[in-house]
C-alpha cells in the first residue's frame, strides 16, 4: 500500500471520527423541543422593525441530521402540523439577543426567536453552536492560531498600514509596470487578486484591460476597497469579495492571479501558502504575478550590530539594580535578544561571500513545500574576518508575455518596506579568505503565521561551528532612516586628503571662473552670474 493512500485513509478516518464525535455531542439535543416560542420576522433591517410571523406561540423541534440539525416549527396548539422546516448548518448565521431572544438566518427568512426562559435560549444556542463544529476547518484555520489570525487581519484592516505599503513606491510602481508592461496577459482576461487590501493591484489590472477582477480581502479593508471601486466607477469590472481565499467560492476560473504575498525574509506571515492555494482557481497555463521568488543568503561581518545586541542583554548582568540581583536572568536575556532577527539595511560590503539563492516557484511549488524549508549552504569566503551571522533578502520576478520585471529587496537596490533581515550567531566564528563555510538554514512553519529559523554553520576541514534558532515572528526593527555607513576598513586612501583635494579643486575652479568673468552660484556649475560689468563699471 502506498504512503499516499495510507495517509489519505488515515485522514478520512480522522474526519469520520470528528463527524461522529460531533454527532455524539448533538445526540443529547436530538428530538429536544422548545414550547412557547414567539417567532418574529425582520421586516426592515435598517430600522430594525419586526412583525409576528405566526399568530400564536410555537413549538420548535430539533433533530440531528447528517448535514446539521433539522428544525421544525409547529403551533403550540397544533403540534401535529409542521408549519416550516429549516436546516441549521455550519453556515447558518445566528446571534444571541439579550437573555431570551435569538436572531437566526434560515434560508430566505431572518427570524427572531423569543423563548420562555433563559435556560431554553441557552440550550437552543448550544444546538446551533454544536452544528458549527461540523464545518471542516479551512486550510488557513488549520495552520493558524485564532489569536494570530485576529491580530493579523486587524493590522491590515487599518488604512495607515495600507498607506505604508502603497507609499513604498518601489513596490507599487514595480507592480504597476509589471502589469501594464504585460497588458497582453490582462486584456479581456479574468483576474484574481489575492489579499487585495486597498485593491490597488486590482485597479492596475483594470488599467491593463482586464474584463473582470475578483478582489479577495479577509480584513475590514474590504469595505474600503469597495468604496474605492464605487467612487472610481469600476464596480462593473472589480468585484470585492470579503473572506479568505481558502474559504470563498468564485463563479469561474481565472486567467491570471496577482498578489503581494511576500513578508520579511520572503516567507514571513505565511501568505505565500495562501498565494499557492489560490492556484485551484487558475486555468491551465494561467499566469501568476509574481511568478517566482529568490531568497538570497550570505554570511556577514558586523561587530557594531553584534555588540549592540550583546550589550542589551548585559542589562541582566547587574547584581545590584536598585538593590536587586538580576544575574540569574542573564542567560535567558541573552537567548531572547539573539533569537530576534534584525530588520534594517546595510552596505553589501559587509557580506563575506557571494549569496546562496533558494528559489520558490509560485507556479509549481505546493503549499506543503513551505511547511519545512531546508536550504543547504556553501560559501566560498572572499574576505578574512569574523562571521557574525547570515543576511537575507529576496527578489521576485514577474514573468510576462511581453517582458520580465524584477522587484528586488537587495541591499544594492533602492530601499523597500521589506528592508533586509540579519540573523546573528551568539558565538561568532573567525574565518579566512579561501575557506569554505557550509551548513544549512531550516525554516519550520508555526501556527503564528511565521517560522522558527535555525542556522547551522561549519568551517569545512575544521571543528569550528556555530548555530542559533530565531523567532521570525518577533523581529527587532532597527532601521532609523540614517544613511548606511560603509563597513570599517574599506577606505583605500586617506579620507582627509581626499576631502581637502576636493576642496582645492573646487577653489581652483572658482578662481578660474572669476578670471573668466563668471562665478558659480551655490557651488552649482550650471548657474552663474556675470561679474565683469561690476568690475569694469563701478558705481
From Swiss-Prot:
Q: Which domain of life is it from?
A: Eukaryota
User: Binding positions for S-adenosyl-L-methionine?
Assistant: 162, 171, 195, 217, 246, 274
Under Gene3D superfamilies, the record lists: Hnrnp arginine n-methyltransferase1 (2.70.160.11), Pleckstrin-homology domain (PH domain)/Phosphotyrosine-binding domain (PTB) (2.30.29.30), Vaccinia Virus protein VP39 (3.40.50.150)
Q: Please describe what this protein does.
A: Methylates (mono- and asymmetric dimethylation) the guanidino nitrogens of arginyl residues in proteins. May methylate histone H3 at 'Arg-17' and activate transcription via chromatin remodeling.
User: What is said about its interaction partners and assembly?
Assistant: Homodimer.
Descriptive protein name: Histone-arginine methyltransferase CARMER
Single biological process term from Gene Ontology: chromatin remodeling
Q: What happens to this protein after translation, modification-wise?
A: The dimethylated protein is the major form.
Amino acid at each position: 500500500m502506498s504512503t499516499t493512500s495510507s495517509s489519505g485513509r488515515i485522514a478520512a478516518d480522522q474526519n469520520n471520527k470528528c463527524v461522529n464525535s460531533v454527532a455524539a455531542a448533538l445526540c443529547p439535543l436530538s428530538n429536544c423541543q422548545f414550547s412557547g416560542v414567539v417567532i418574529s420576522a425582520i421586516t426592515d433591517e435598517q430600522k430594525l422593525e419586526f412583525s409576528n410571523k405566526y399568530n400564536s406561540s410555537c413549538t420548535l423541534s430539533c433533530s440531528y441530521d447528517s448535514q446539521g440539525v433539522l428544525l421544525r416549527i409547529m403551533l403550540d396548539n397544533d403540534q401535529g402540523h409542521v408549519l416550516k422546516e429549516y436546516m441549521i448548518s455550519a453556515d447558518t448565521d445566528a446571534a444571541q439577543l439579550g437573555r431570551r431572544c435569538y436572531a437566526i438566518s434560515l434560508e430566505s427568512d431572518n427570524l427572531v426567536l423569543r423563548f420562555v426562559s433563559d435556560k431554553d435560549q441557552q440550550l437552543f444556542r448550544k444546538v446551533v453552536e454544536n452544528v458549527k463544529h461540523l464545518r471542516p476547518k479551512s486550510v488557513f484555520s488549520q495552520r493558524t492560531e485564532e489569536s494570530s489570525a485576529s491580530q493579523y487581519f486587524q493590522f491590515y484592516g487599518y488604512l495607515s498600514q495600507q498607506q505604508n505599503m502603497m507609499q513604498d513606491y518601489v513596490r507599487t510602481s514595480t507592480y504597476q509596470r509589471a502589469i501594464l508592461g504585460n497588458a497582453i496577459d490582462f486584456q479581456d482576461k479574468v483576474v484574481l487578486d489575492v489579499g487585495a487590501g486597498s485593491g490597488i493591484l486590482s485597479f492596475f489590472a483594470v488599467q491593463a484591460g482586464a474584463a473582470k477582477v475578483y478582489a479577495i480581502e479577509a480584513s475590514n479593508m474590504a469595505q474600503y476597497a469597495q468604496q474605492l471601486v464605487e467612487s472610481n466607477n469600476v464596480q462593473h469590472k472589480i468585484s470585492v469579495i470579503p473572506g479568505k481565499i481558502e474559504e470563498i467560492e468564485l463563479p469561474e476560473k481565472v486567467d491570471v492571479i496577482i498578489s503581494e504575498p511576500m513578508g520579511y525574509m520572503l516567507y514571513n506571515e505565511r501568505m505565500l501558502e495562501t498565494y499557492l492555494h489560490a492556484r485551484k482557481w487558475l486555468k491551465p497555463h494561467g499566469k501568476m504575478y509574481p511568478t517566482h521568488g529568490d531568497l538570497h543568503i550570505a554570511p556577514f561581518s558586523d561587530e557594531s550590530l553584534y555588540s549592540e545586541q550583546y550589550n542589551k542583554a548585559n542589562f541582566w548582568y547587574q547584581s545590584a539594580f536598585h538593590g536587586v540581583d538580576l544575574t540569574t536572568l542573564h542567560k535567558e536575556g541573552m537567548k531572547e535578544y539573539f533569537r530576534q532577527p534584525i530588520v534594517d539595511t546595510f552596505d553589501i560590503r559587509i557580506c563575506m561571500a557571494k549569496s546562496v539563492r533558494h528559489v520558490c516557484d509560485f507556479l509549481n511549488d505546493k503549499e506543503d513545500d513551505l511547511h519545512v524549508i531546508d536550504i543547504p549552504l556553501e560559501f566560498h569566503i572572499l574576505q578574512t574576518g569574523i562571521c557574525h551571522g547570515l543576511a537575507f533578502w529576496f527578489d521576485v520576478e514577474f514573468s510576462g508575455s511581453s517582458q520580465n520585471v524584477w522587484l528586488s529587496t537587495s541591499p544594492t537596490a533602492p530601499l523597500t518596506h521589506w528592508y533586509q533581515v540579519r540573523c546573528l550567531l551568539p558565538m561568532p566564528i573567525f574565518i579566512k579568505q579561501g575557506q569554505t563555510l557550509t551548513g544549512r538554514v531550516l525554516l519550520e512553519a508555526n501556527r503564528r503565521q511565521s517560522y522558527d529559523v535555525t542556522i547551522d554553520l561549519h568551517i569545512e576541514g575544521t571543528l569550528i561551528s556555530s548555530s542559533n534558532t530565531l523567532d521570525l515572528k518577533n523581529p527587532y526593527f532597527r532601521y532609523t532612516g540614517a544613511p548606511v555607513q560603509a563597513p570599517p576598513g574599506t577606505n583605500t586612501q586617506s579620507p582627509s586628503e581626499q576631502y581637502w583635494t576636493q576642496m582645492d579643486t573646487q577653489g581652483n575652479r572658482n578662481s578660474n571662473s572669476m578670471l573668466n568673468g563668471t562665478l558659480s552660484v551655490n557651488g552649482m556649475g550650471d548657474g552663474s552670474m556675470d561679474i565683469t560689468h561690476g568690475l569694469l563699471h563701478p558705481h
